[in-house]
């Protein structure tokens, strides 16, 4: 049974066939203002809203220009990003000037609900992506978008119910995202407080009944380097390191096979062993270290450095490498400016010379490791809830419009 019928029936709305019209018949796509770089100010009366402000760029430019009213976006306005990362957005902040790569949508037909139109445009974005092999880097022309045919219930009340339904779902997703972000900030804060800052012997925050100073130990004195190869093809599972998800199946992560078909020359990594990925990325300037938790074994390229803990609690070591306290030591062994094709030039012998500041009391190590593992489990639980809600929304959108 189509979802639009379910909603019509559930809300006691009369069922009528949906109409199909061109967007340009009901919606006016208003151009934003083009700015030269010299017109963009560091301070001013109005913020200038650019495409990047919806994504990863949190830097704002300003303008003191007084423009005609249709060049401003106000709270509640429906916008459409037509360049780079394209798609609809509802602006929910203060009055801004919107940039040239953004349209403001002015609905000309009083029988078209803004919230419904926003929801339909989300599904249309997915159709456009599919027609361009899934890329989000698309330039949508005004002529093209005005000719897009959209389906709409003639009953305004039905449109509003549909729009409200998805808005409530979006609000629930946003709430769970905020909870997840807060939990990650809490974890980050505890990592900063429960490990000693550089040159300090004790952390700012500590469990009761532990008093001794933390001492420095070289990684080589508390771990063992692993050089085991996959000669007998004990594993055919190629692994990769994700900064967010740890050591995971390479085929699933990239959605294709990256590793060589012959993995005999790869390292064989077993559950509980650690791998250092020397690839640097945003937020991880010295690479990442992760433990293999999700599989019994797997194979990794010899570009990785593999080791296992021998004289340190494994959970504690995992959380130590989740922090940034080892960055300073790692930076001392990397030649200045020597970063080759995204890889740091840290030799394995140098990596094991890294000094870690650790509590010598094994019980304290265990307690710290357990504390962060429990916090991580809560974070994973919220991540799973968020993923399920996102899947639910996609399913409803598909049932509704496609």
Predicted regions and their residues:
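Feature detects amphipathic, helix-rich regulatory segments
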Residues: 1-402
